[in-house]
Structure formats: structure tokens, C-alpha cells
């Protein structure tokens, strides 16, 4: 009996393309954007935790992560999510950072008929508060991981995830949390998919 053929890079790229073309990415991002995770608005405190508990946690659990929500070291600051998926302690480990909070929606500054918390696609561009900062980025990272797991059954590396909900107000408590969780956050490389694109049509990568 011949051995099953291992998926190729082309197979992975094709599977990732299908996630986009099937509308899965757009549907999931629409659900994330719909939550008004405005960290600048004290009235949205419960929504910030809801994003972690109801949106991020189930997605990560589905991929075999151990997931925990932690109180913020700073009083009244929103919680943080820490997750890990260890296939083998001997394998390299990546740490993915993301934030689920957004700036004020500024509803009255959007074009008539549009809302910052309801996505819309115009001329191939998807609009909605958080699509580019930062819900879209960490969602893409997670869907890429899920695509590989579904395709190969494993990743071939370990993954840790840190998601905060207060980046837009200066990340209160993040430094203290990271110091306290130093061992839990230990990794070989950090992937922080946040920041500007120098040119819209060309991916930007900062190394260091």
C-alpha cells in the first residue's frame, strides 16, 4: 500500500484561496466587526470581554488550543486572552499578537446608509471599523492556521496567542501582564499583524 501524499504548498495556497472565495472570511469578519468594541467608550466594557469570550475563545478551542481569559492587572481595564496549542515541546513556537478593540465608530462621519459596525464591500474593498485594525489581521492568521490543520492534521510548530482589548487606549496592563506571564508567552518568534501598509497593493513586513 502506497503512503498518502503529503499536502504541498500549492495545496495549502489553494485551500486558503477557497476560504476567501467561499465567503467564509467575509462572513466571519462581518460578525467580528458587528461588536462595538470601542475601548475608548466605558459603556462598551462588557462588549470587550464578549469579543474574547464569544468570538475568539470558540474559534481557538475548535483548533485545539487551550484558552484562558485573564483579568487585567490594571483595575477596570479589559481582560486579556492567552491561548496555546503545543504539538511537541521540541518544535519551534510562534506567538501571535492581536487586539480586538477599535477606536470610536464616529457613526455620523460615515456616508449615508453606511455604519462603521456593518461591513460593506465597495470596488473590491471591505469597509467596517476593525477590518484593517485589527480584527481582520488576527482573523486571517487564525483562518490560515485552521486551513493548515484541516489540510495536514497538524501544523508542525507550536502556537501561542495573546489578544488584548485596550490597544487603542495605550494598552494599560499589557506590559505588567506580559512580565507576569513571561514563561507562558515564551516563543521563538512574534507575529504581530498590526500596523500600516506603506502601499495598499503590496504587503508590508517589518523585521527585527
Feature-to-residue mapping (PLM):
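Acidic/histidine-rich catalytic neighborhood of metal-dependent amide-processing enzymes
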Residues: 134-208
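Acidic/His- and Gly-rich active-site-bordering loop/insert found
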Residues: 2-131, 148-157
Amino acid at each position: 500500500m502506497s503512503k498518502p501524499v503529503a499536502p504541498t504548498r500549492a495545496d495549502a495556497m489553494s485551500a486558503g484561496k477557497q476560504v476567501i472565495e467561499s465567503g467564509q472570511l467575509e462572513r466571519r469578519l462581518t460578525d467580528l466587526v458587528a461588536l462595538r468594541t470601542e475601548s475608548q467608550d466605558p459603556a462598551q466594557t462588557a462588549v470587550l470581554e464578549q469579543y474574547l469570550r464569544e468570538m475568539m475563545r470558540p474559534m481557538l478551542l475548535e483548533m485545539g488550543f487551550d484558552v484562558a481569559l485573564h483579568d487585567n492587572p490594571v483595575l477596570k481595564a479589559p481582560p486579556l486572552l492567552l491561548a496555546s496549542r503545543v504539538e511537541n515541546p521540541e518544535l519551534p513556537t510562534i506567538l501571535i499578537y492581536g487586539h480586538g478593540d477599535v477606536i470610536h465608530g464616529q457613526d455620523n462621519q460615515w456616508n449615508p446608509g453606511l455604519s462603521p459596525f456593518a461591513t460593506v464591500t465597495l470596488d473590491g474593498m471591505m469597509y467596517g471599523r476593525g477590518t484593517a485594525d485589527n480584527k481582520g489581521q488576527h482573523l486571517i492568521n487564525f483562518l490560515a492556521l485552521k486551513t493548515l490543520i484541516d489540510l495536514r492534521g497538524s501544523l508542525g510548530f507550536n502556537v501561542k496567542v495573546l489578544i488584548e482589548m485596550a490597544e487603542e487606549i495605550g494598552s494599560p496592563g499589557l506590559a505588567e501582564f506580559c512580565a507576569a506571564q513571561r514563561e507562558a508567552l515564551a516563543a521563538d518568534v512574534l507575529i504581530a499583524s498590526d500596523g500600516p501598509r506603506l502601499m495598499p497593493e503590496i504587503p508590508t513586513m517589518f523585521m527585527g
